Amino acid sequence: MDDTVKNTTDPVFLHDTFLAWCDKQPVPVIEGFGMDLSKIKAEPWDLYGMNGAICLLKGRDDFNSIFCFELPPGSKSRDIHHLYEEIVYVIDGYGSTQIETPDGDKHSFEWGRNSLFSVPLNAKYQHFNGSGTEPARLATVHNFPFLINMFRNEDFIFNTDRDFSERLGPNGYFQGEGQMIEIRPGRHQ
């Protein structure tokens, strides 16, 4: 009798789950050393409820990437939540974002061109275009590639209800209590 344990699944070596996920998305995937995010063609993306494109910078490794989103005039995104960290930069337009914290409180804030913000990890949020005549364009830098390659489970990343309330900070963060940091000439990081 053979007591050898047989592997019933194929090994997953040199497989990039993120790139395979990108291939299944109905939006353009653009790769290059640089790209003008204000001119990229964005197509409808039901997952987010807005138009979008996936932007892959050469040399990015498997840690992060960019999604470019466009909200048509007067539109809004779907309610979204996910386990990846994301920083949002507003390329053009103005609008608002509503965040629902784990305790059910809703906070909203406005944004405009050159705004930069981040939504708390796995909090539900929705973007709104504040213009009835002009689109709003957002670029997000995120660590989704790292997480999807680690867990290999899209459902886990987009449908986990775990709250991270310890990462929310004080309520003042949602009420405009902040400190304006003036731009200083020179190179700073």
Describe the role of every protein-language-model region.
Residues 68-69, 79-81, 85-90, 108-109, ...:
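His/acidic/aromatic-lined binding-pocket segments of jelly-roll/cupin-type domains
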Residues 55-58, 77-82, 99, 108-110, ...:
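Short histidine-centered beta-strand/loop micro-motifs
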Residues 50-52, 65-83, 101:
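Conserved short histidine dyad/triad with adjacent acidic residue
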Residues 75-78, 96, 115-117, 121-127:
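Histidine-centered metal-chelating micro-motifs
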